Amino acid sequence: MSLVVADRMSAAIEAVAALGASAPAALAALHEFLDGGSVTQLSSVLGLSHSGTVRLVDRLGAEGLIERVGAQDGRAVSVVLTPRGRRLALRIRQAREKTLTSALSALTSDELDNLAAALDTMLTTVTRARVEERSADSHDRPQPWLCRLCDFAACGRSEGNCPVNNAVTTSDQS
């Protein structure tokens, strides 16, 4: 079932923005929490190599979706969304929301509550495993952030209710 939903979501995103697999995540990350971040930070979020992220940034820049902004000292370069990039990031999020809403529409309220509880448990397990993998891996292979496509308003991050952050915090305290 998860593959069906993932395939539908990918198709919906591709219909809105035929930019490949990593571009929607880059636009979402820049829109939600990383606007003005560096290529290195974006690379970390996406789980791409630095050179792969540079190529992605070049491609998104050529499409007029992002631009590089240099710092006053000329050393640091930030990646920011253009107004066009911001609009596309919102359309991508709306396509994802519509697809997910459609997939969940046949569930009753009780079924939705049960699914939410099960997904919360699964997310906590996956998040803790990811933290343990990163701690054990001395090479620190790039791994994409779990939140790279997150809608922060929906997850409750601004109120301190981000399930991924809570799982990591709980894991750190145990």
Where are these regions (language model features)?
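Generic structural concept
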Residues: 2, 27, 31, 82, ...
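Hydrophobic alpha-helical core bundles mediating ligand binding, dimerization, or RNAP-core interactions
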Residues: 2-13, 89-107, 115-126, 154
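N-terminal helix-turn-helix DNA-binding core of bacterial DNA-binding proteins
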Residues: 10-51, 63, 162
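Residue-level marker of regulatory loop/turn positions in helix-turn-helix DNA-binding domains and
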Residues: 19, 92, 139
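Residue-level signal for short amphipathic helical patches enriched in basic/charged
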Residues: 33, 37, 95, 107-110, ...
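Charged, amphipathic alpha-helical coiled-coil/dimerization segments
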Residues: 58-113
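C-terminal regulatory/oligomerization modules of transcriptional regulators
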Residues: 113, 117-174
